[in-house]
Amino acid sequence: GGIRIMNIELCKAEIKRHEGEVLKIYEDSLGYKTLGIGHLCQPEDPEYSWEVGTKVSQEVVDMYYEQDFEKHYQETIHVFGSEEDFENLPEPIQRVLVNMCFNLGGTRLSKFKNMLKACKEHNWDEMARQMEDSRWFGQVGRRSIELQKIVLECCST
């Protein structure tokens, strides 16, 4: 075991690739105002009142991404239970959980009870199976298959 430090830069690059990056205000699939790397505009954001299509600077996009990433990283640890247990996971598994949390939010991630249980038991085969046994898996397409592949690669080591 021992503490494994998550590769933050790699994790952020993977999420950015999966979320995409848009330098303007756009509507997500549910019609919510979004900007940058999947940042859901909040009423307290200055951009909340902006028209869809308004350009947003790279600096602003990066700032929200920093905040959102940190928030979801902390949420992932909270959902998982303890920082120590989270840090004892193989590094790629840590990235998968943070990526899922960024995509789903902590509340929805916490509903993946069987997947989290398998993860806590370091049962990667079962974790991969449980990922697939969800509506999310079909909804996000290539992203879920890629994340599942990372989990399955942990089996083979």
Where are the language model's segments positioned?
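Glycine-rich, flexible loop/turn motifs
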Residues: 31, 82, 143
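Surface-exposed patches in mature extracellular/periplasmic domains of secreted proteins
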Residues: 23-26, 79-90, 130
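Residues that flank catalytic or metal-binding motifs in active/ligand-binding sites
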Residues: 11, 29-31, 93
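Structural recognition of the beta-strand scaffold that forms the well-ordered cores
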Residues: 34-36, 96-99, 126
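Short coil/turn segments at secondary-structure boundaries
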Residues: 25-31, 110-113
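Long, amphipathic alpha-helical surface segments
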Residues: 2-21, 39-41, 56, 60-66, ...
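Alpha-helical segment that forms one wall of the substrate-binding/catalytic cleft
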Residues: 50-82, 91-98, 103-109
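Substrate-binding/active-site groove segments that recognize
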Residues: 27-49, 65
